[in-house]
């Protein structure tokens, strides 16, 4: 009976050890994949179109603001037949960024008071 119990404990220990190593391998693969995605994002970010510049050549090339990506907005100017596209920030996202900035400042003040 003791040998069966000892064998069971040994089996569970080996199984948990092999599972832990497999999870470490998966975690390492996820970290490598994440790093490669970040490198690609940094490379892509260098070629973005700034706010209020023409984005008609690539409508997905607008730069990111502090929290959100700007949107390529196209319109026809008054009295013109040519379509004009520029990178702009939608108003609702602008207000959300302002609110987030104020909340961040307020959080800093609270931290200073109680920190």
Swiss-Prot record:
GO CC term (a single one): extracellular region
UniProt entry keywords in alphabetical sequence: Disulfide bond, Knottin, Secreted, Signal, Toxin
Tissue occurrence: Expressed by the venom gland.
Propeptide segments, given as residue ranges: 21-44
Disulfide bonds: 48-63, 55-72, 62-87, 74-85
Pfam families linked: Toxin_35
Signal peptide: 1-20
Family: Belongs to the neurotoxin 19 (CSTX) family. 01 subfamily.
Domain topic, free-text comment: The presence of a 'disulfide through disulfide knot' structurally defines this protein as a knottin.
Protein name per Swiss-Prot or TrEMBL: U3-lycotoxin-Ls1k
């Amino acid at each position: 009976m003791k040998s069966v119990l000892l064998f069971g404990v040994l089996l569970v220990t080996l199984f948990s050890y092999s599972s832990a190593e497999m999870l470490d391998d998966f975690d390492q693969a996820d970290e490598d994949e994440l790093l490669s995605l970040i490198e690609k994002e940094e490379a892509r970010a260098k070629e973005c179109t700034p706010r209020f510049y023409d984005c008609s050549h690539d409508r997905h090339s607008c730069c990111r603001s502090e929290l959100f990506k700007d949107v390529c907005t196209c319109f026809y100017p008054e009295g013109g037949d040519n379509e004009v596209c520029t990178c702009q920030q939608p108003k609702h996202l602008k207000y959300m960024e302002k609110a987030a900035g104020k909340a961040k400042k307020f959080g800093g003040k609270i931290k200073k008071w109680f920190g």
